Swiss-Prot record:
Keyword Metal-binding part of the UniProt annotation: no
Short name of any one Pfam family annotated for the protein: Ribosomal_L11
Subunit structure, interactors included: Part of the ribosomal stalk of the 50S ribosomal subunit. Interacts with L10 and the large rRNA to form the base of the stalk. L10 forms an elongated spine to which L12 dimers bind in a sequential fashion forming a multimeric L10(L12)X complex.
The protein's role, per its UniProt record: Forms part of the ribosomal stalk which helps the ribosome interact with GTP-bound translation factors.
Protein name listed in UniProt: Large ribosomal subunit protein uL11
Gene3D superfamilies the UniProt entry points to: Ribosomal protein L11, C-terminal domain, Ribosomal protein L11/L12, N-terminal domain
Organism of derivation: Streptomyces griseus
Gene that this polypeptide is encoded by: rplK
Length: 144
């Protein structure tokens, strides 16, 4: 007989700085209420995201009824990648009136390539359009 599947008791989604997870809020309270060993998660997450230090990396944590967990790291948010590529700290307060930066089509394609596994797109062109739309809504002009 095949082993029984563990019963899932919770799904937690967090956005944490890569390699910098610690038991302080927001990580501690979110995991604590599900009974997860917080330090164990922090060590595993920091080890998994060490190469991406300085970026915000979303993580999906699946908690099982025996209080064990698994987690999947995602690609950094598109907005963060766009801001980094454009070299600005934040988007425009009035995106359709005030433009804060410009991105080239090549930069948009590069970001789309990075984000492709997490986007709802079948090919690179569709992913590029999604990224370009996000950039426009932040007051960043896309050229090309």
């Amino acid at each position: 007989m095949p082993p029984k599947k563990k019963k899932v008791t919770g799904l937690i989604k967090l956005q944490i700085n890569a390699g910098a997870a610690n038991p302080a809020p927001p990580v501690g309270p979110a995991l604590g209420q599900h009974g997860v060993n917080i330090m164990e998660f922090c060590k595993a997450y920091n080890a998994a995201t060490e190469s991406q230090r300085g970026m915000v990396v979303p993580v999906e944590i699946t908690v099982y009824e025996d209080r064990s967990f698994t987690f999947v790291t995602k690609t950094p948010p598109a907005a963060k990648l766009i801001l980094k590529a454009a070299g600005v700290d934040k988007g425009s307060g009035e995106p359709h009136k005030t433009k804060v930066a410009k991105l080239t089509a090549a930069q948009v394609r590069e970001i789309a390539t990075t984000k492709l596994p997490d986007l709802n797109a079948n090919d690179l062109d569709a992913a590029s359009k999604i990224i370009a739309g996000t950039a426009r809504s932040m007051g960043i002009t896309v050229e090309g």
